[in-house]
Amino acid sequence: MTLWINGDWITGQGERRRKTNPVSAEILWQGNDANAAQVAEACQAARAAFPRWARQPFTARQAIVEKFAVLLEAHKADLTEVIARETGKPRWEAATEVTAMINKIAISIKAYHARTGEQKSELVDGAATLRHRPHGVLAVFGPYNFPGHLPNGHIVPALLAGNTLIFKPSELTPWTGETVIKLWERAGLPAGVLNLVQGGRETGQALSSLDDLDGLLFTGSASTGYQLHRQLSGQPEKILALEMGGNNPLIIEDVTNMDAAVHLTLQSAFITAGQRCTCARRLLVKQGAQGDAFLARLVDVAGRLQPGRWDDDPQPFIGGLISAQAAQHVMEAWRQREALGGRTLLAPRKVKEGTSLLTPGIIELTGVTDVPDEEVFGPLLNVWRYAHFDEAIRLANNTRFGLSCGLVSTDRAQFEQLLLEARAGIVNWNKPLTGAASTAPFGGVGASGNHRPSAWYAADYCAWPMASLESPELTLPATLSPGLDFSRREAV
């Protein structure tokens, strides 16, 4: 029984599905997708649970969410193993994901009060009050790269605001989704407040097409995000928050500490086997001897990175991609760029055929035309050389995406220029592109989102504002508007 609907674990009636470890092919999870009728049932359960959940005092909702945080801490080791085995990422990285999930609770509570709490301004004859109300029933679509942390970033603030939810994990990480929901169950969520439907494209389409949804919160690829945007077009009454990918540039302008710059680049491009939406995809390196030396050192160190199993000891820097098919897609993208005229600096290599273990690849594309403006979700770094900083910014902005951008430089003035001219929601200076803070908004422009940033700003799309002018008693104004006469006339 792999679906959780209205507080009950039930068996899906859709397509049979199984999840294997992307390196060892060990079977980890088996179950059936939710069919359209079960998706509708989950929505009905969420709708029925909404009025009571929304009327709960915030402190009551907060108590359940904080109990979930306690359970995450108590089961951190177990959840770390589940995430590592299912995604293929090393244990150390899976552990940091669970830690981020735990930390998200307190941050979301603070964000609720800061962004969407109640504010009152005293007036001469009463008060002006700002309150926030939950939307109602929201669908949450989770990704596979952070199957615990990223859905958590939607679910926690949405529940705190008083919404009820239907959660569909990625079909590539059903085990993590189920494991997390079981902790929510133990936290004491009332029946129907949070529902789990497993499945792939058909389940997702059934969920996103429900008329009774009040909104949809999505993290995933740009192609799916655009599809959802088209599907919900003409429905302005529904909130749609899209957190999509990027074709992110990292500018290497001035290197005073060669190894520090190489380390920052490795963290930006290859952490999580290149499967972070903020990963550097395009490396822009200044022409000249210093840039040549930097690239040589980068290729040297990156060439020593050996991806390993999730349970290898010593632990590797990177693990496997989410699937062997994902690794094959990266290889095909590299070959395509070679065919366009790219010069391979470091060839990606499958560690073992049929698995998702893939070494990093670096290819120079200076002067190459018709390079696809796409997010290749894996350890493939494209290099361009530039002559001057204005050209670097032009190259950085030469994308339909706009998620993250970074600069390695000793010149603060160059960073200030980048802040003014970059088209990206995250712009870092001498910090990895993959470094983000939950105390700041997270999102991008262009094809990277629809101006609904998450993290600290997630509270904004989980509630709508209600403004009130209030007075405990009704009185006639001392000064009336022109033309109004309230004088009492003698009866004739």
From Swiss-Prot:
GO terms for biological process: arginine catabolic process to glutamate; arginine catabolic process to succinate. The active site is at E243, C277. Keywords: Arginine metabolism, NAD, Oxidoreductase. Pfam families: Aldedh (PF00171). Pathway: Amino-acid degradation; L-arginine degradation via AST pathway; L-glutamate and succinate from L-arginine: step 4/5. HAMAP family: Aldedh_AstD (MF_01174). Belongs to the aldehyde dehydrogenase family. AstD subfamily. Catalyzes the NAD-dependent reduction of succinylglutamate semialdehyde into succinylglutamate. This is N-succinylglutamate 5-semialdehyde dehydrogenase. The gene is astD.
